[in-house]
A protein has these predicted regions:
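Conserved ABC ATPase "signature" region
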Residues: 100, 104, 111-129
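Catalytic Walker B motif of ABC-type/P-loop ATPase nucleotide-binding domains
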Residues: 158-162
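ABC ATPase "signature
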Residues: 217-218
Length: 249
């Protein structure tokens, strides 16, 4: 389980302060996918980085499986698989070599690394390029490799920032099907996205975020009932209009 409790984060430069996350709270349960849905610059990535121990909040706290992300970052990292929207992989290595490297970083045994590599390669349809250099792979292949790397240690909590961004239809389908399977294995999954179809296909619950504030947190059915609509796009635009940010979407 993941708990986010009243977190805020402000970034400062010489000219101005930018409030990236403003008093934001939500929780994500096992065997579910929670989606943070919002336009670019809404605060989705900052929120995920705070949960994943890569940033510290100015206020509030986050916890993963009962471990505080600030106080117990090592324990949190053991239990999460985090995929950034701009994850960079070494172009000189192969996916197989990367998986071994990250498996060793997670103190896995050789036999477990080999077994897990085989499982992930089959799950993500990677066998044809497992021994090819990352620098020679397509965008979709690189994304699959990045997903596999983030999951090599079989984490209990999965946090993916824009997991289908920039992917072709077939690769995006592979990724969404994979996440559904993982959810059904009892994992806690949080994703960020600005793509409505991804949220509709995957999420048990969505949090809609504008200007760093979580303005709605509900099931899709709950949102449809509340706003008198039967699709997520119309709900989203009604909320954007209400919040005065319709120009952003």
């Amino acid at each position: 389980m993941v708990k986010v409790e009243n977190i805020s984060k402000t970034f400062e430069s010489r000219r101005k302060k930018v409030v990236a996350v403003d008093s934001l709270s939500f929780s994500a349960e096992p065997k579910s996918i929670f989606g943070l849905l919002g336009p670019n610059g809404a605060g989705k990535t900052t929120t995920l980085r705070i949960i994943s121990t890569l940033l510290k909040p100015d206020r509030g706290k986050t916890s993963v499986m009962g471990f505080d992300s600030v106080v117990q970052p090592t324990e949190v990292r053991k239990r999460i698989g985090f995929l950034t929207s701009d994850m960079k992989l070494s172009g000189n290595l192969t996916p197989k070599e990367l998986l071994r490297f990250y498996g060793e970083l997670n103190h896995m045994r050789d036999t477990d690394i080999s077994k897990r590599t085989k499982e992930l390669s089959e799950y993500l349809d990677m066998n044809d390029f497992l021994d090819k250099r990352i620098g020679k792979l397509s965008t979709g292949m690189k994304q699959k490799a990045a997903i596999a790397v983030s999951l090599i240690h079989d984490p209990e909590v999965i946090i993916f920032d824009e997991p289908t961004n920039g992917l072709d239809i077939l690769t995006a389908r592979t990724v969404t099907d994979f996440l559904k399977d993982y959810r059904n294995q009892g994992k806690t999954i949080i994703i960020s996205t600005h793509i409505m179809t991804v949220a509709k296909k995957l999420c048990n619950r969505v949090g809609i975020i504008f200007k760093g504030r979580l303005v709605e947190d509900d099931t899709l059915e709950g949102l449809y009932e509340k706003f008198g609509e039967d699709n997520l796009e119309d709900v989203f635009f009604k909320i954007a209009d209400r919040e005065g940010v319709i120009e952003l979407v």
